[in-house]
Structure formats: structure tokens, C-alpha cells
Amino acid sequence: MQTVVGGAITAAAAAGAGAGLWWYAAMWPQSQIFGPQLIAGRDPMEAALTFDDGPNGDTTLRLLDILAEHDAQATFFLIGDCVRQQPQIARRVAEAGHLIGNHSMTHPVLAWQSAARIREELSGCNAIFEDVIGAKARYFRPPHGARRPAVLRTARELGMTPVLWNVTAFDWNPISAEEIAGNIDRGIATNRRKGRGSNILLHDGGHMGLGQPRMPSLSATAQVLAKARAGGMRFVTVDAWG
């Protein structure tokens, strides 16, 4: 009996460890277990501002104004369905010289989806981009950061480089601009100590639909741009890194 129980405990422990490793590989933004993904460059004085889940009406337009005031370029990972609903704003993002990336058509957790659904989400988003801005995306960020080998393989088959991040603003939570900026500042400081660039995850929209309140994110962006530039930080788009 002890042998049977002990074997069951060992099997359960192994299964738990395997599940934990799979979750880490699928959800931790800096994990490379499922294959190479672009995170950031090696210059600790470089940072990329990346914005997910847009376009989002006046919020995205105000963000474009803030970036222009600071002469900064950013990377926008747009949801295809939001682009379909607000094509004129997506075009404004592209016309301002920012880099546009694919964030899927409807923002599902792709790690749990079938291979057919994954391809539909990514190719559908790129088809919308071609119609609206005249070009497919060359970079892809999985919604929620959730991926598995099939997600990364499909992105590459469609000519896109998967991109994650190494600074999380946590701005999807109802927190203040000061808290968001503090999260970013701490993330940049950590990366600088480690001798690497910073890929900053922010949001100008939300996957629940248009009209998501993101003004604290915009205010935090202005704060970070002013402070980082004063300290010699250079802002790039993710294509500068690969």
C-alpha cells in the first residue's frame, strides 16, 4: 500500500511540476522555452513604448499628440476588430510614423485555441491591416502574452516576429498615473542594472471593446518620456531590435 501511495504522490508531483513549467513557458513574458521571441535590445539606455489593444478613439488620438510633443516613436499592437471599427485612427497611427503590430483579430487566449483558430486570428488581423493601412504587420504580440509552439510557428509562417516585453506597467488595473509611471521606472531601473534595454507594456485600448478608460496610461507616458529623456534614455520601436 505504501508503494502505491508513494507512487501516486510522485506522479502527482511530477504532473504538477509539468503543469507549472508549461504555465511558465506559455505565460511568463520573458520565457523562451517555446522558442525565440523578441524581448529587447542589449543597450540599457534604449526603451520601446508599446501600446496594446487599440485603436481606441480619442484616447489613441491624444496619445499620438503626446508622442509628437516628445518627438517619440512607439509600437502599437492593434486588434484587428478595433481597426475594422476605427480605420481612420489606425491610419493616423501609421501616418505618424509609428510601428504597427498584429495583436490578433479578437484578442483570445491563443495558447488554448486550435491551430486553425490561431491562423484565422493572425491572418485575419493582417488582412484588415492590408485593407486599412496598405501593409501587413511584421511583428506580433500574443494577447495576454499567452502562447504555445503553434502560436509562435504560425506567426513566423505569416512573416511576423513574436514580441513580448520586460517592463509591465500594470495599467489595465484601476491605478493612478503616478503608480503606472512608478511601475515603469522600476522596470527600467531593473533592466539597466542587468545591462539590457526595456520593452514597456502599456495600453491605449482594451480587449473588452472600444471606449476603455486609459487616461492614466497617457499621463504616465508623458511623465516617463520627460523623465527618461532627461536621463539620456532613447526611445525606439521594436524593429530596432530585430
Task: State where each predicted segment sits.
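His/Asp/Glu-enriched short active-site or ligand-binding loop at hydrolase and phosphoryl-transfer sites
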Residues: 146, 152-193, 233-242
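Active-site beta->alpha N-cap acidic-glycine motif
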Residues: 26-111, 117, 121, 128, ...
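Basic- and aromatic-lined ligand-binding clefts that recognize polyanionic substrates
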Residues: 132-146, 151, 155
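Terminal accessory/targeting
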Residues: 1-50, 61, 65-75, 186, ...
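A short acidic, helix-capping loop that chelates divalent metal ions and anchors anionic groups
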Residues: 108-113, 207-211
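Charged helix-capping and loop-helix junction motifs
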Residues: 91, 118-122, 177-184, 214-220
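A cross-domain feature marking catalytic cores of carbohydrate-active enzymes
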Residues: 51, 78-80, 102-104, 142-144, ...
